[in-house]
């Protein structure tokens, strides 16, 4: 299976510094800063990228589960709202709210919701965010 990468460079202090985040595929490269993360400044932030990853994975996984259940979707749209809050002298992602909609011929609301609940438990990004070991390699330059 595929291994994917993302990278980031940060220059300067927390509040005055700036950085760039990149996807290994080259599909995205964007600036981020204290302002884009904790205020409403221009640029992206880690939580926004986590939200996009969760929404993208969830939509694909739900379409797959619906198809396996005999109800191929015409369209699945998901928004993930990632909440970052102060905690223990730092910050913590406290919740991710998923809102998903599907155009799925021949399925009722109850079965659609059942498939969405199954997907919440099996989507690879959802599983990773529920608790994944983080391995660290640190090198001082």
Roles of regions detected by a PLM:
Residues 1-52, 59-141:
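Extended beta-strand/beta-hairpin segments
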């Amino acid at each position: 299976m595929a291994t994917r990468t993302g990278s980031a460079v940060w220059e300067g202090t927390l509040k005055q510094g700036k950085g760039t985040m990149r996807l290994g595929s080259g599909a995205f490269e964007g600036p981020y800063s204290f302002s884009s993360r904790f205020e409403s400044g221009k640029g992206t932030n880690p939580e926004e990228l986590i939200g996009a990853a969760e929404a993208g994975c969830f939509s694909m996984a739900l379409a797959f589960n619906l198809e396996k259940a005999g109800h191929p979707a015409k369209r699945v749209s998901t928004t993930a709202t990632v909440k970052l809050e102060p905690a223990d002298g730092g910050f913590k992602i406290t919740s991710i709210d998923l809102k998903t909609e599907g155009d799925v011929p021949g399925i009722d609301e109850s079965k659609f919701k059942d498939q969405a609940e199954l997907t919440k438990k099996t989507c690879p990004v959802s599983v990773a965010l529920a608790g994944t070991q983080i391995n660290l390699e640190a090198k001082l330059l």
